[in-house]
Amino acid sequence: MKKIFNLSVIALLAGFFAVSCDRNDEDEIQNVESIKIDSVKIAQDTMDVFTIQTIKTYSTYPSACDNFFGYDYIRNGLERNVVAYSYTINGTCTQATRVGVNGFNFRPEEKGIYTFKFWNGKDNSNQNIWIEKTIVVE
């Protein structure tokens, strides 16, 4: 009787793991790539040191399968380069383009003039195009 019980528990667990590992390929991330930032909204172009403001970026996504993944935020002194990334899922999605808004918090720790460069794609010569914004920190 104990042997039958052990075998049934093993069979039950094996069946559970077989079903739980049966993954649906839809909604899996297929690709992550940079997406151009179309525009930027900075509420205050002058702010105090150690205060926080949210900087918003707007990007156009080609379908409902494409969504915001994150930012690459590179600091170099008082200069900031910002590149947005999107991910694409493998699923049944509408192909209508849409504008997505995302943001990040900026909290300066020293006074000065900060220059932000937001990646806006590449030109015909394959050179990066940047949207430049400045924030004066007092």
Predicted regions and their residues:
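First exposed extracellular module after export/assembly in secreted or surface-exposed proteins
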Residues: 29-138
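General secondary-structure edge motif
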Residues: 1-2, 53
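Bacterial Sec-dependent N-terminal signal peptides
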Residues: 3-5, 14-39
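Sequence-pattern detector for short linear motifs
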Residues: 5-6, 136
